C-alpha cells in the first residue's frame, strides 16, 4: 500500500498506518485540519502537531491532543488545571453565598450545576458543512 499523502509514492511499512513516515502523518493531519477549518495544535508544550480529527458521516470530532505518546501527560495536566479552576469556582461561590446570607435572610440561593467531570478524551463534535443533510428539501415549494 502506498502513502495516502498527495504526491507521495513511498510504501507504508507499518501495518495499520496510512502514511509512510511520521512527518507525512503530521502533514496529513494538517490537510484534514485545513479541510474542516481547525487551527488548533496539540495541548502538550513544544509538540507542534495538529490535533486528532476524526471525520464521521455528518459530523467531525476534534480532540485536544494529537494522540501520540504524551496523551496521558496532556490528560493529567488538563485535569489538574481543571481541578484548580473548580476549586476557585467553589470558593467564590461559597464566599458569595455567605455574603448574600448575611445581607438578607429571605433571599434564595441559586444552585448552579457545573460540568465537573469532563473526560479529556471526549472530543468536541461539529456538524460538517460539506455533506447535505436534506434540510433544504423541506423548504422547497
UniProtKB/Swiss-Prot annotation:
Location of region: Disordered: 95-116
One Pfam family from the record: DUF728
Tree of life domain: Viruses
Biased composition, class Basic residues, residue ranges: 100-113
Protein name: 16 kDa protein
Amino acid at each position: 500500500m502506498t502513502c495516502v499523502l498527495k504526491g507521495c509514492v513511498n510504501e507504508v511499512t507499518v501495518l495499520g498506518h496510512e502514511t509512510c513516515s511520521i512527518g507525512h502523518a503530521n502533514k496529513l493531519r494538517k490537510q484534514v485540519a485545513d479541510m474542516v477549518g481547525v487551527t488548533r495544535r496539540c495541548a502538550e508544550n513544544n509538540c507542534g502537531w495538529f490535533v486528532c480529527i476524526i471525520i464521521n458521516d455528518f459530523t467531525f470530532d476534534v480532540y485536544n491532543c494529537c494522540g501520540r505518546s504524551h496523551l496521558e501527560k496532556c490528560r493529567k495536566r488538563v485535569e489538574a488545571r481543571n481541578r484548580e479552576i473548580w476549586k476557585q469556582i467553589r470558593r467564590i461561590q461559597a464566599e458569595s453565598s455567605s455574603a448574600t446570607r448575611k445581607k438578607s435572610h429571605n433571599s434564595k440561593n441559586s444552585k448552579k450545576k457545573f460540568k465537573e467531570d469532563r473526560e479529556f478524551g471526549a472530543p468536541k463534535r461539529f456538524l460538517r458543512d460539506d455533506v447535505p443533510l436534506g434540510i433544504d428539501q423541506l423548504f422547497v415549494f
